[in-house]
Amino acid sequence: MSDTGAQVLASYSIKGGVGKTTLAVNLAAEAARTGVRVLLWDLDPQGAATFALRTKAKVSGGAKALVSADGELAPHIRGTDIAGVDVVPADFSLRLLDVHLDERRHPRRRLAALLEPIAGLYDLVLLDCPAGISLASESIIAAADALVVPTIPSALSARTLEQLAGFLEGLDAPPAVWPCWSMVDRRRALQRRSIAELVLQWPDALATAIPMSSDVERMGAERAPVGSYAPRVQATQAFRALWAEIAQRLWT
């Protein structure tokens, strides 16, 4: 249990283009479907989660006001079309989040501190994170109970996970790290072999794999989680199973 009273789950990877936003939006929808009160905080200046949830890309006062000494998260929270899911939208001002965090005392604890006052409002906070390792990443990691790391099975992904592990080794109380296989094509022998090898290195990896799917690719056009427009397809079933697996880890 995190200091906020809600479980804080970050969709995070050093590497870009691995499906972080896809994962965050669909996990939010599946969690809400089971009765979990969800806040999705979009921390990526590209604002893809904000777009997918049909929310205006606006941070009032910009990132500087958000993380200022008297900044509060509650005024930035917006409802969405998905029952049980609220969002803190992103805009392009978040590209300077590192700069504004660096101006604060205890910058690595700032995001966790912003979450504390809304402790009783949500069961789950999902952080949709930009790629890379930065001061903002460190603040995200300090706020999270667990990092779900979408990982396309390959040798490069193994290296990315190793880099993340090396970084976390230097922290006093690092979050759990749960690799999640993303954009998986089971027909590819190389991917199957990569998963088998990575599972040996990362025994806490989530068992459910998210398939490479045209239904997932439609999210940008539909501006919605997959389950809302294609409830019976393989990808929806995978996100549903993945959420069940994560929920069991968070609350048991």
Locate each region found by the language model:
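P-loop NTP-binding core
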Residues: 1-252
